[in-house]
Amino acid sequence: MKDMGEDRPGIGHSTNLVGLPTDLLASAWFNQAAPEIHIAGVREMNRSLFEMLAEAPDLESAGEAFYKYMIAMFGLDPEQQDHRPGQGGAVRRFHASYLRLLKGWGYDTNAKEGAVLKGWVESRFGLFPTFHREPITKFASKAWITYIEEKMTSRFHNNSIYVQLDLMYEFCQWALARFAAPGESALLLYRGVNDFTEHQMIERIDNRQVVVRMNNLVSFSSDRGVADCFGDTILETRVPVSKIVFFNTLLTSHPLKGEGEYLVIGGDYLVKASYL
């Protein structure tokens, strides 16, 4: 990892769990080449899940199987996630859930849930966030310290939350290859912005094409009309399938379904910018 005494963060750590240099993973070249990647050991340690998924006739059935597997593995029954007194007046312990993080992201990408999700990307893919509430310009900044504090919030780290997210990512990759985008290495997605506060301009190719450094986790939409609602500048790019963490039809019921939203791992993207 880059020396923490330096003022400006690099792109990320020198190591990650996907077996590629982080600089390469973050590069515009990677995002255009769109090779396949996996988080080390996740599928191997959860063979029963993927054997069960192989029997699913469609995405809806696969999503239901995944949901039930996660309930069994992590105790995610609704009764186990609230704070109402149980028998004898005891308070049930809150069980952190990947679905709770998605819900929080849907409300505010810069809330504590967003910090935990960005922290997971940093841990697994090696990429530092570039924005959390405000631009992260140096390690000693208030923005960096706030991010570190919030990504470590104990409320969300009592139930192997990063392992839950590992499984969600690998299920997403399996579902894209099997049902949602078979044979595709990248998908055309859109992001609406009002300015480039959250995006670092890396290179201008021409009047409409630029390379921008996206935050380590960002939201896109498959529907340009939806992206229009979030800003008067539309960024259009082809996102590697391997960088999609979650998409709107992955599960039959989840907090992000209404926006046709895709959660995407960041880095340097060649984008076409158009204006409303």
Curated annotation (Swiss-Prot):
GO terms for molecular function: NAD+-dinitrogen-reductase ADP-D-ribosyltransferase activity; nucleotidyltransferase activity. Monomer. One of its GO terms (biological process) is nitrogen fixation. The keyword Aminoacyl-tRNA synthetase does not apply. It comes from Rhodospirillum rubrum. InterPro entries: DRA_trans. Involved in the regulation of the nitrogen fixation activity by the reversible ADP-ribosylation of the dinitrogenase reductase component of the nitrogenase enzyme complex. The ADP-ribosyltransferase (DraT) transfers the ADP-ribose group from NAD to dinitrogenase reductase. The ADP-ribose group is removed through the action of the ADP-ribosylglycohydrolase (DraG). Keywords: Glycosyltransferase, NAD, Nitrogen fixation, Nucleotidyltransferase, Transferase. Optimum pH is 7.0. The keyword ATP-binding does not apply. It catalyses: L-arginyl-[dinitrogen reductase] + NAD(+) = N(omega)-alpha-(ADP-D-ribosyl)-L-arginyl-[dinitrogen reductase] + nicotinamide + H(+). The gene is draT. This is NAD(+)--dinitrogen-reductase ADP-D-ribosyltransferase. Disulfide bonds: none annotated. It comes from the Bacteria. Its EC number is 2.4.2.37.
